[in-house]
């Protein structure tokens, strides 16, 4: 039995965590199927340890290459320990970030070569790709305004120019792979965004024999 892998992406402050929670709630109406909510970097004991190193504001000297390799290491453990086993059990996996975060942040944001990042992350994930990536797109000024200035981690403390590059990178990635991406205008009300996401996810699940007959897929959110 094969599960479904759905990833939420976007710059910090775009609302990924909120929309993931909305989708999780909608999916709970589907009886007889398990939904796993997770995040990366993190999701495993090793991954959470790496996450602390990556986001620690005391590590300001970290190079872009070190950052990219740490993310890939955490992703390798996350994929092997969490995602692949859950998909093999037929679960729906919802993840706050995955591979495209590295392409956007370390590739477009830090200026590292995309093909090198793809090579490293192919090793880390074994080529695993999400069935759907939901991109919460929000202007940088609006995203920064949503962040708590007293609780920003190392990456959230980057400048506006950095996040503009990351945002442009995400949009380029999405335009290059429209079949796997849903771009959501995160300036809209949260409920409107959630409805658009649920409509796309519902259509995705209806096309899967395992999920097509589940209660809750024929109606709205």
Curated annotation (Swiss-Prot):
ATP binds at residues 10-17. The keyword Kinase applies. It comes from the Bacteria. It is an enzyme of class 2 (transferase). One of its GO terms (molecular function) is ATP binding. GO terms for cellular component: cytosol. Coiled coil: none annotated. Keywords: ATP-binding, Kinase, Nucleotide biosynthesis, Nucleotide-binding, Transferase. It catalyses: dTMP + ATP = dTDP + ADP. PROSITE patterns: THYMIDYLATE_KINASE. The keyword Nucleotide-binding applies. GO terms for biological process: dTDP biosynthetic process; dTTP biosynthetic process; dUDP biosynthetic process. Its EC number is 2.7.4.9. Phosphorylation of dTMP to form dTDP in both de novo and salvage pathways of dTTP synthesis. Belongs to the thymidylate kinase family. HAMAP family: Thymidylate_kinase. This is Thymidylate kinase. It comes from Desulforudis audaxviator (strain MP104C). The lineage of its organism: Bacteria, Bacillati, Bacillota, Clostridia, Thermoanaerobacterales.
